[in-house]
Amino acid sequence: MLTPQRSAWSLKSKVSSEKPRSKGKGITKNLDSAATPFPPLGLLNGGDLDRGGEDMEAWKRFKDEGLLDESICYKKDRESLASRIIELEKDLHEYQYNMGLLLIEKKEWSSHFEEMKMRLAEAEEILKREQAAHIIALTESEKREDNLRKALGVEKQCVTDLEKALREMRSEIAEVKYTAEKKMTEAFALEASIEEKRLDTERKLHSADAKLAEASRKSSEINRKLEDVEDRERKVQRELNSINSERKALEKDISEQKEHLREWEKKLQDGQNRLLDGQRHINEREERINEAEGGLKKKEEELEEAKRSIEGTRNTLKRKEEDLDVRLRSLVSKEKEIELKMKNLQKKEKDLHEIAEKLDHREREEIQKLLDEHRATLDTKKREFELELESKRKSVDEELKSKFAAVNKAEKEVNRKQGLISEGEKELESKMDKIKIKEKDLETKSKALKKWEESLKSDEKKLVAEKDQIMKDTHELKVSINELESLRDALNAEQHQIAEEREKLEISKEEREQYIQKQSELKQEIEKYRNMQEELSKGIESLREEREKFEKEWESLDEKKITLQRETKKIHEEKEKLEKWHHKDQERLRNEEANAKADIERQLEDIKLQKEAFENTMKHERLMAQEEVARRLADVTRELELRKHDLEMNMQKKQEEIERKLQGKEREFETRKEAELSRITSLINLNNSKLQKLRIEQDRLDREKEEVELQKKKLQEDQSEIQRDVDTLRQLSKNLKNQRAEFIKEKECFLAAAERCKTCQNCGVSISELEMVGIIQSSAEIENADIVLPSLTDDHIEQHMKNKGSHVTSPQTGSRVFGSGFLQKCTKIFKFSPGKNAETSATTTPLVFGEELDIAASEDAAANDNNPAADVERVTVNPSLVFGEQLDTAASEDAAANDNNPAADVERVTVNPPPLAPVATEQNETEESSLPPENDSPPKQRGGRQSTRRGRGGKTVRRTRTMEAVVDDAKAILGDTLIVEEAKESSQQNDEQSQGASVHTGGTSNTRQKRRRAPASEMTNSEHDVEESESQSQSISIGRGRRKKRQTSAASEVQAPVVERRYNLRHSTVAKNSVAATLAVSDQAKVQTKASHQASHDNNQISMGDDPALEGSHKVTHTVQKTTTASVMEVSSKPAMEETHEENIVVRSVEISEMSASEEAEGEVQGVPPIAEEPATPSSGSSTSGDIGNDDDMDDDDEEERHNASIGKKLWNFFTT
């Protein structure tokens, strides 16, 4: 079958190409073939073989003697090599020709197979026709039997029943087929989906690797941007979140894929179970069919017995039987042919099954490997995502291990092949020279082989798909064969039934009744049978369609097989040259041996056809062919050895390079991993530290917020209390306005008394008319003045709260709070003596009574705030000409009581001026007069001073008011504009509570208090504004000393107007403009006369220096007795807790800012009235302790209170009731 016809070959070429091969070496062989003449053609016809042998021997001798030239031999060698190459090319063409023949034979076999299919189809059609004819015959016989004895009706029913049963069976079989096909398609679809999912998983893994690379890149960028800590933390958190989310998403995808795979495996198992169940159902149905056939056989026996009774129908039945016998014989002959064809088909199917089983086995192994690999990769990826960098190292190790395993396997295969190849090493050593020449050709062929291998890989994938299709086709063929066998069995059964029915027709008359009874059953069975036949016909049609499809697919498969066979043959040829590539070289050698044998057989056949004489020559040719095969094998083995050696070297080099690269990558990976881990740990530590700091700050802020809320609550309460106080003040002002008439009346009485007592009873000094004029003017101004209601402004409160802060008063200062101080100062204002009414009216500027109340209330409110502003008291002294002789105590006390400025109550003031710079401008002077908050004396000194005044506590109503209540009242009136700096209170509270104000009454060393100069740079604008406003306000001296002063009318006329001052919680907007508005031209003239009068007395008095900085530098304390300059004494103090006296003496550092007599002309200070200091005698002011509240002062106070009982008690009773 496989021997091609080679008519184109000539005997001459064979003899010429093979005859010289009997020599040992290829070169001599070629030289012999080229140099020696060919034997004559006559030898072929005759038997002169000996002559040819003699000629050969002669040529050999000639050659051995060395008569040939070397150049000719070299040329002949080259020609022989070229001829050898040509011969090899011819061999290749021959091999290709053989491949073409094989393909042609394959086509022939495929055509033969198609013919067999066509024959089968024709046989099936004949069978169908015969079945139809048989059914027609049966119907005809039934009709005749109905016409004769109505017996054939029962047979028809039986046939219909049988047909129905068959139809049901066929329908069930078709359904089972359809379900099986669906399941197979689903299985293939699932396989495709699994592959797609695998690809998706690989893509996702690549994307995950890319994302990991991106994460590393981002981490590097984060390490570069170490400047902004917050941005770095956010980026790190975002990256961590993204990585976690990606990891979770990948884990979810992997879990879903695992679930899909598990579901797919479950579905496959379910499909297999269903197929098994379907097969079981088919087997059960076949058993049922067999049982039905047994029942039918019984019924047929009964029918035969009934037929025996029918004698009239025997002849017709015999004729029909003969016809049926003839047809059955033809069917049997056709069935035998079909069986032969089926056997052939079965053989081919077995071959296909074997191939399919091999392919299935390989596919299963590959699929299992793929599944194992995928599972391993999935597990490794999980671990990688969970363990991050550590898992990467493990995965790299696993990959390296797998690669090393693959390399080891390849090495084992190479070693195995080396063992096989080492056997032919001895034979291949002799042909090294030829192989060197062929190395170039082999290199080109190796490149082609690589290309072929790549094409083979793609073809193998195609083969896998085609194998699947072949498996499907084989399965369908099996099903169709089984159906044909079942049809054949059914036909045999039907034949047996017909024969039995014929026998049963000969039943005796006794059994006719039973036959009639069973005819109905037989009719039903016949109907079933007809149904079965219809189903069979449908199944046959479906089988035809399937056969057509199968034929089409088979044709496509044949075409693919042809192409694949071509490619496989080419692959086999190349594999025969190289055993390393899956034993391709061994197959090539086998094909060459087979080709050599085929050539020998062809030659033998040609020689046998031509002559028997060529048997000897054919034997010789066979020997030559064997030698050629051996030589070729030796050449191939030599080539294989060289190629193997080269490949081994290349593999070793590649392995070394791969190992080096892997080691370098591992080192880089470890270094990067360590660097990233260190960076991540550093970032984590930084983040943790920052988080801890942020938590601490957050806790601190929460605490501060709580404190602020508490302070806000306190402030609200203080605002409410302030509002209440304001309401009370307004009510008091209204009451005072109503009582002004009474006061005017009393004042008129006082003026009348003053006119009577123009001369002092104690000292005999007469009161000048100028002082009386001042008293009259002051009384007129008081009558004409309107009482202005106290009011609050937002600006003052805001500035006050910003500069001073809101502090709770200490327990020591709690007794002297807002209500008590205010009432005391009100009593001081309204204590007028009849003797001094005219002097006060002449010396003081027109001051509204309500404004004095506001001033007193503001000072008490400032004292209640427990801030430095509460400890600053301004002692304003009305300037007057002090005479050498002192008035008596009663007259001086009355004059002090009638004075509107309560600062005149200070008897002796010890001044310790601050070390301030000289006054240059109005602004500098106002700045020098102000003090920072931290320069005040502690509140303990005030407590000591208050303890000396408790003797008069019964005559005053003291209201305990806290700073919180005052602030709450102010906030309730002003709204939420009050800004309280609560954060500064905790740091300033202890310092500010320890601050107080004290007055130095003596220049001795008992005070022992250092004077600290506050630099001008420490003073803020807010402090300057507050102290400037306080310098304009009139505060009342706390210490009640001896009031032994005499004020002349000239001095009172020269006095500048007192700045109007409202409640201390706001700035006074009228203060700066009130001086210019209240001064008259006549007053200015009087001021000039006063200045000249004061200049004459400056030599006799120890007065304050105009340069406060000079006085502060020397720290000289002056006892002021007489002065003619207007000055404003600002009382302030610095905290000097370590230098306070042990006797708890109240010390007030008085800061005096002086103005010269030329103040009116120059206008350096606006809003500050020039006030003369009080004269003090040495006998009354020689105490060095500076304590104002001593026993002498208390006695003088008691005398004053008894003397002023006529007016003071009334006013006091008015304010206290």
Swiss-Prot record:
Cellular component aspect of the GO annotation: nuclear lamina; nuclear matrix
Biased composition (Low complexity): 892-904, 1173-1186
Keyword Mitochondrion among UniProt keywords: no
Annotated stretches, region: Disordered: 1-45, 892-969, 981-1057, 1087-1117, 1152-1217
Coiled coil spans: 159-746
Protein name listed in UniProt: Nuclear matrix constituent protein 1
Compartmental location: Nucleus matrix; Nucleus lamina
UniProt keyword annotations, A-Z: Coiled coil, Nucleus
InterPro entries cross-referenced by the UniProt entry: CRWN
Name of the gene this protein is made from: NMCP1
Biased composition (Acidic residues): 1189-1200
Annotated family: Belongs to the CRWN family.
Known role: Architectural component of nuclear structure that plays different roles in controlling nuclear size and morphology. Involved in the organization of multimeric complexes in the peripheral nucleoskeleton.
Organism: Allium cepa (Onion)
Record's compositionally biased regions (Polar residues): 1-14, 986-1007, 1087-1103
Basic residues bias (residue ranges): 947-960
Gene Ontology biological-process entries: nuclear matrix organization
